[in-house]
């Protein structure tokens, strides 16, 4: 359990204390990853099924590594090699896999609400690895973990999230978690990519990139979610990059020297980020990737039966 939660589906449901429970445990998990032998027996005898209906590099790989470092058995499932191609429904797929007695199902799906639907039909814990444009809770947690590492705290910090806010599940999870940890969040992007009423979640909205990033402690850059967009919402990627992309010149003129730059990946280089910025000294993008393993270890540990008060196995 994470606090009172059997599942990790939406950070909107998590309290500040429950978010901190995961982040604090992830500190110990990251220490395990620094060892020469990256293996602890914490989840020996447990099993994790990664149920991915969408493509993934970082999330799927890090959940698999997280499970294996904790000594859990990990099964990677792909829709293209399953009975989904024969017409099997999501619920039937999940119930059949759950009949094999896994402890955790990690699911990524193009439909918002898919992980919750699965959770209503299985007895094991369910982790959302991203569902449509709804949420991506583990990404929100690892972004906050990275910011705590780099900034010390999120309390009172200003975070700018720039890009396709309307179609980004990362933006929503980041917004929920960051505001609960005391950050001031600015959202920025084309007006056609800012959802109406988003200010009700505690953010302020800027349509000009400079207004959003000047004075910020961190900037989270997001790609355009082409796979979720029907009719074009922007004139083109060149125009988008000119107005909302971050290049070396803009970064030098507008960003504080100590400002850090995040991106959940994959990066569309030359669109939302220039290569010089993505690979530059202010970028913490690879730190995010590394921290993703530690945070997902913490999530699996807590949901598969670990107790944060008895985390000695992970620390031993």
UniProtKB/Swiss-Prot annotation:
GO terms for biological process: 'de novo' pyrimidine nucleobase biosynthetic process; 'de novo' UMP biosynthetic process; amino acid metabolic process. Gene3D superfamilies: Aspartate/ornithine carbamoyltransferase (3.40.50.1370). It is an enzyme of class 2 (transferase). GO terms for molecular function: amino acid binding; aspartate carbamoyltransferase activity. The keyword Transferase applies. Signal peptide: none annotated. Keywords: Pyrimidine biosynthesis, Transferase. SUPFAM superfamilies: Aspartate/ornithine carbamoyltransferase. Pfam families: OTCace, OTCace_N. The keyword Transferase applies. Its EC number is 2.1.3.2. Pathway: Pyrimidine metabolism; UMP biosynthesis via de novo pathway; (S)-dihydroorotate from bicarbonate: step 2/3. GO terms for cellular component: cytosol. It catalyses: carbamoyl phosphate + L-aspartate = N-carbamoyl-L-aspartate + phosphate + H(+). Carbamoyl phosphate binds at residues 58-59, 108, 136, 139, 265-266. L-aspartate binds at residues 86, 169, 223. NCBIfam families: asp_carb_tr, PRK00856.1. Belongs to the aspartate/ornithine carbamoyltransferase superfamily. ATCase family. PANTHER family: ASPARTATE CARBAMOYLTRANSFERASE, ORNITHINE CARBAMOYLTRANSFERASE, MITOCHONDRIAL. Catalyzes the condensation of carbamoyl phosphate and aspartate to form carbamoyl aspartate and inorganic phosphate, the committed step in the de novo pyrimidine nucleotide biosynthesis pathway. Heterododecamer (2C3:3R2) of six catalytic PyrB chains organized as two trimers (C3), and six regulatory PyrI chains organized as three dimers (R2). This is Aspartate carbamoyltransferase catalytic subunit. It comes from Anaeromyxobacter sp. (strain Fw109-5).
């Amino acid at each position: 359990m994470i606090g009172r939660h059997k599942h990790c589906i939406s950070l909107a449901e998590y309290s500040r204390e429950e978010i901190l429970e995961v982040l604090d445990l992830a500190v110990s998990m990251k220490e395990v990853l620094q060892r020469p032998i990256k293996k602890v027996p914490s989840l020996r005898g447990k099993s994790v099924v990664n149920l991915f209906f969408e493509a993934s590099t970082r999330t799927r790989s890090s959940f698999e590594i997280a499970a294996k470092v904790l000594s859990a058995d990990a099964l990677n499932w792909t829709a293209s090699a399953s009975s989904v191609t024969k017409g099997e429904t999501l619920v039937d797929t999940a119930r059949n896999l759950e009949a094999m007695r896994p402890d955790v199902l990690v699911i990524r799906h193009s439909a918002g609400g898919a992980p919750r639907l699965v959770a209503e039909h299985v007895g094991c814990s369910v982790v959302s690895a991203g569902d449509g444009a709804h949420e991506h809770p583990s990404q929100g947690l690892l972004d906050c973990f990275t910011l705590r590492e780099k900034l010390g705290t999120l309390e009172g910090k200003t975070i700018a999230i720039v890009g396709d806010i309307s179609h980004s599940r990362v933006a929503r999870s980041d917004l929920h978690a960051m505001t609960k940890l005391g950050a001031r969040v600015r959202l920025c992007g084309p007006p056609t990519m800012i959802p109406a009423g988003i200010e009700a979640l505690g953010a302020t909205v800027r349509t000009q990139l400079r207004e959003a990033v000047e004075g910020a402690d961190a900037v989270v850059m997001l790609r355009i979610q082409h796979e979720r967009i029907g009719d074009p919402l922007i004139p083109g990627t060149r125009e988008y990059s000119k107005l909302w992309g971050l290049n070396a010149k803009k970064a030098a003129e507008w960003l504080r020297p100590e400002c850090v730059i995040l991106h959940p990946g994959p990066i569309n280089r030359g669109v939302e980020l220039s290569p010089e910025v993505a690979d530059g000294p202010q970028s913490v993008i690879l730190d995010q990737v590394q921290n993703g393993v530690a945070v997902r270890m913490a999530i699996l540990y807590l949901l598969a039966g670990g107790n944060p008060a008895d985390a000695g196995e992970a620390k031993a």
